[in-house]
Amino acid sequence: MEAIGAAITKNNSGYDSFCLTNAKNNNIKVSDSDPLNWGVAAEAMKGSHLDEVKRMVDEYRKPVVRLGGETLTISQVAAIAAHDHGVKVELSESARAGVKASSDWVMESMNKGTDSYGVTTVHGATSHRRTKQGGALQKELIRFLNAGIFGNGSESTHTLPHTATRAAMLVRINTLLQGYSGIRFEILEAITKLINNNVTPCLLRGTITASGDLVPLSYIAGLLTGRPNSKAHGPSGEILNAREAFQSAGINDGFFELQPKEGLALVNGTAVGSGLASIVLFEANILAVLSEVLSAIFAEVMQGKPEFTDHLTHKLKHHPGQIEAAAIMEHILDGSAYVKAAKKLHEMDPLQKPKQDRYALRTSPQWLGPLIEVIRFSTKSIEREINSVNDNPLIDVSRNKALHGGNFQGTPIGVSMDNTRLALASIGKLLFAQFSELVNDFYNNGLPSNLSASRNPSLDYGFKGSEIAMASYCSELQYLANPVTTHVQSAEQHNQDVNSLGLISSRKTYEAIEILQLMSSTFLIALCQAIDLRHLEENLKNSVKNMVSHVAKRTLTTGINGELHPSRFCEKDLLRVVDREHVFSYIDDPCSATYPLMQKLRQVLVDHALVNGESEKNLNTSIFQKIATFEDELKTLLPKEVESARGAYENGNTTISNKIKECRSYPLYKFVREELGTSLLTGEKVISPGEECDKLFTAICQGKIIDPLLECLGDWNGAPLPIS
C-alpha cells in the first residue's frame, strides 16, 4: 500500500479536521477539536427553523442534484423523489477514483485468498461457510432476498411508492460514492440513468432495516442484473421488465454480472428507510411552519388576546422552538386588523369573554415549540444518515483491510421516525382542539354554530361533518403515534436479534404526514370560512346599527307635537346593545321576540322609562308610550335592511372591506380563495365542505401552499418584537 499523507483542513462547521488521505482517494475526517462529532451536530442546529425551511425549499427547487457522498440534503432527496419534478442527478467525477480503488481492492484481496465477509463467506448467520465463487454468491444473495410479494396489480399495498424508490436509489448512490463499499462506478452510473429517465424499479416491503433494507434493495439489484421477476415503472407509468427498463433508461451495455461484494454493496444499506424518511421530514418541516401560522390565524378569527406571544413569557421558558413559534405568531398578529378590533371589543366589554383564552390558543407556542425541535433534530439525524456509509464490511483501502461492523443498523431512522410521528400526532391534536373551538358557538366569540353561513341556520350545519372527519383523522393519527421500534423481533436465525425497523417506522410516519395534511387542509378551509363570516358579521352589524339609529331618530326624537322627547337620549344605549350583541345570535330573524336583540333593545327603553320619573305620567313625555312605535317600525324595516346587506355581501359590494386584506396572514387566505377557487360554504349552495377541502389537500400535497405560507412570513426579521 502507498503511504498515508496528512493535512489539516476546515470542515463545513469551521472545525479543524485531521484528514488521513491515501493515494486511492479515500478521506477519513477526524476533527481534533470535536472528535465525537457533537460540535458538528450542534452547529447544524444554529439559526432559526424558518430559515432552515427556506433553505430546504430553495434546494428542493434547484434543477440539478450533484452527488459526491457527503453533502446530500433531505430536500434534494424529496426533489428527486417527485419524479415529475424535472430534477436531474449528476455524479461527482472526483469520486470515481475512490470508488474504483475499493472495487479493485476487493478483487485483489480475493485473488490473494484474503478471507472477507460477503466475498468469500456466505451471509449472516451462515457466514461460517466459505466459497471461492464470489460472483455466484452475489447472484444467490439477490435471489434469496427477492422474498417480497407483489400481490394483485403493480401498485398493490405491498409495493413501495415510486417516490420512496427514487429516494432510495439516490441515497444508495450517495453512500456508495464514498468509496468504502467495493462496487464499480459503472453500476452507480446505471442507477443514475434509471433516476434521470424516470424508470423506477418496483420495491417490495419486507425489511427490518437491520442489515440494511435487504429485501427492497434486492429488487434494484435484481433489475440491474436482469432477473426475470424484476418489474419497473416507465416514464408514463407503464410496467416494464428488466430489458425494457434498460432500454427506456438508455443503458446500452446490457445487464451487470456482479463481481464479489457488489451484490452486498447494493443491498446492505439503510437507503430505503432513510430515503423515505427524507421525504417525510421535508413535508413535516413545512407542516410545522404551517401549524404556527394556522395558530396565529386562529387567534385572529377567535378575537384572541395577543399577549400570549409576548417575548418575555417565552424567553423565561428558554426552549428555542417555543421562542421561535411565539415570535412567528407574534409577527403575524402584529398590526393585524383583527387584533385591533378585538382590543376595542375587550375594552368596551371586558366581561364579554374570559380573561384568558383557552389553552389551544394561549399555549400554542408552548405546545408546538418542542415538537418543532423534535422534527428539526430528526431532520439533522436523517441528513447525517443519508450521507453516511452504512454497509458491511467497509473497505479501508488506506489500511488494507475490511472492517466488519454494523453501520447497516438503522436505529437513527427508527428512532427519528418514531419521534417525528409523535410530534405530528401532537400537532394534529392541537389543530383538532382549535378546530373544535372554532365551530362551537359556545367558545368562538360570536361566530355561528358549525360556521354555518346560510340565512336559515336550521337548514345549514356547516362544518359539522368536517368536525366528525377531524375527530377521525386525529384518532388515527394518535394511534399511529405509537412506537414501531418497541416491536422488534429476532430474525435471520437470531443473527439479526436486534433490528431498527427503520423503514416500517418511516412508512407509518408517511401515513401520519398524509393524515396531518388532511387535518391542515380541513382546518384552513374552516379558518377561511371564519374569516368570511367575520366580514359578513361586520357588514350585517353595520346595517343593523344604521337601521336602529335611523328608527330611533324617527320614533324617539320628538313627541306628538314635534317637541324634543326624553326618549331621544336612548339612541346611544341602543347602539351599544347592537355593538355588544353577537350578530349571529339573532340575524336569521332579527326582530324575533325570542332572540336577544329585541329583548335587549326593549330593556334599554324600559330602563330609560324607569328613570324618567314623573314624566312617564304624561303621554307627551312618556318613554313607555314610544316602545311599541319603535319596535313596530324596526320590525318593518330591519329585516329588509339585513337582506339587503346580505345581498350586497354576496355580490361583492360590501360597505366594509374584508379585514384580512390588512393582515400578514392574507397570502394564505388569498391562495385558498382566489388561486384554488373556493368560496364561503352555505346550505344554500350545492358544494360540500369536502369538495373545498379536497382542492386544498391536493394543493398541499403538490407543494403549492409553500409560497403563500412563506409570504406570510416574508418580512419577519427572525427575532421577536422588543420587550416594551
From Swiss-Prot:
Contains an active site 4-methylidene-imidazol-5-one (MIO), which is formed autocatalytically by cyclization and dehydration of residues Ala-Ser-Gly. There is a cross-link at residues 210-212 (5-imidazolinone (Ala-Gly)). InterPro entries: Aromatic_Lyase (IPR001106), Fumarase/histidase_N (IPR024083), L-Aspartase-like (IPR008948), Phe/His_NH3-lyase_AS (IPR022313), Phe_NH3-lyase (IPR005922), Phe_NH3-lyase_shielding_dom_sf (IPR023144). It comes from the Eukaryota. SUPFAM superfamilies: L-aspartase-like (SSF48557). This is a key enzyme of plant metabolism catalyzing the first reaction in the biosynthesis from L-phenylalanine of a wide variety of natural products based on the phenylpropane skeleton. The active site is at 117 (proton donor/acceptor). GO terms for molecular function: phenylalanine ammonia-lyase activity. This is Phenylalanine ammonia-lyase 2.
